[in-house]
């Protein structure tokens, strides 16, 4: 909650003119409780989850032949009913699991120092912080995901996510409620170690969500912007993990592939790629 009642008051305290973004933020957030600002995160996740996978899903339903050559597993269709069931279950999980978690974790958010006031962070500051969050989340998520593929972790929790042997964007957050809670820890770990402004926190969560949807889209498009990010896994890389399914001990990477390479959990994938290359 901002304690300034007007732009002139804020400028007097900060001893400078507010930027356009800061003035807009003041008008929006002044008098708004920090809990409600933090709760925006679940709203953003629902909007992104609904809209981000939609164009590709519509294209796959209306013009499948136009993009079939880019589909990683072209012979295994995903029905509309399965996608709708997935969407319904994920929305329920967001509202019944992630939503309450947002409220319960609010004291922790305040304790670690995620702020809502002025000044707003610079673009360089926001970029550096998100960069740290990516690295921290990627490493921590690798081990959580790998633990989910132990016999107990898979049987009790992770098998739900692997119901989709052919990934689709809408299935990115499709998982057991306990897995949603566990995977929230790596995502929050970066902001806990390097506290940020709430707007950067929103940005990080949205980017992470979009990345997960892209990774699960099931299509390997040649000119996707993420193709130019070094060590980025992407859809084709993660698709192999779902293709193998229950027995998969490969490609646990969340975003980048370096952990799989360092710890030797990409050997099956590399063998699979080499075999496909020889067949072609």
Task: Describe every region a protein language model picked out.
Residues 121-142, 146, 205:
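Membrane-embedded alpha-helical segments that form the functional core of polytopic membrane enzymes
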Residues 39-43, 87, 91, 127-131, ...:
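Hydrophobic alpha-helical transmembrane segments
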Residues 98, 102-110, 134-155:
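Transmembrane alpha-helix/helix-exit interface in multi-pass inner-membrane proteins
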Residues 1-39, 58-67, 71-80, 151-280:
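Cytosolic/stromal cytosol-facing helical appendages immediately following the last transmembrane segment
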Residues 40-47, 128, 132, 136-139, ...:
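Hydrophobic alpha-helical segments of membrane proteins, primarily the transmembrane helices
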Residues 2, 6-42, 90-126:
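Long, highly hydrophobic alpha-helical transmembrane signal-anchor segments
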Residues 60-111:
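N-terminal helical submodule of small eukaryotic multi-pass membrane proteins
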Residues 43-54, 91-106, 132-134, 182-189:
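Hydrophobic alpha-helical transmembrane segments of multi-pass integral membrane proteins
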């Amino acid at each position: 909650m901002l304690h300034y009642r007007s732009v002139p008051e804020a400028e007097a305290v900060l001893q400078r003119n507010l930027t356009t973004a800061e003035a807009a933020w003041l008008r929006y957030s002044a008098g708004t409780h920090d809990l409600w600002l933090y709760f925006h995160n679940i709203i953003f996740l629902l909007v992104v989850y609904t809209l981000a996978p939609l164009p590709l899903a519509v294209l796959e339903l209306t013009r499948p032949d136009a993009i079939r050559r880019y589909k990683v597993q072209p012979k295994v269709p995903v029905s509309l009913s399965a996608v709708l069931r997935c969407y319904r279950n994920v929305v329920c999980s967001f509202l019944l699991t992630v939503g309450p978690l947002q409220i319960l974790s609010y004291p922790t958010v305040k304790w670690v120092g995620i702020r809502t006031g002025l000044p707003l962070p610079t673009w360089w500051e926001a970029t550096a912080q998100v960069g740290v969050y990516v690295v921290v989340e990627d490493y921590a998520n690798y081990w959580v995901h790998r633990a989910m593929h132990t016999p107990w972790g898979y049987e009790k929790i992770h098998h739900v996510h692997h119901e989709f042997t052919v990934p689709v964007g809408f299935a990115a957050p499709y998982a057991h409620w306990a897995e949603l809670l566990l995977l929230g820890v790596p995502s929050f770990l970066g902001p806990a170690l390097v506290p940020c402004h709430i707007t950067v926190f929103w940005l990080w969560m949205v980017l992470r969500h979009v990345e997960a949807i892209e990774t699960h889209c099931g299509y390997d498009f040649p000119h996707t912007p993420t193709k130019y990010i070094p060590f980025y896994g992407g859809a084709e890389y993660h698709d192999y993990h779902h293709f193998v399914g229950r027995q998969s001990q490969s490609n646990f990477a969340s975003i980048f592939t370096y952990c799989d390479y360092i710890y030797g959990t990409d050997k099956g994938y590399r063998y699979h790629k080499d075999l496909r290359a020889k067949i072609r």
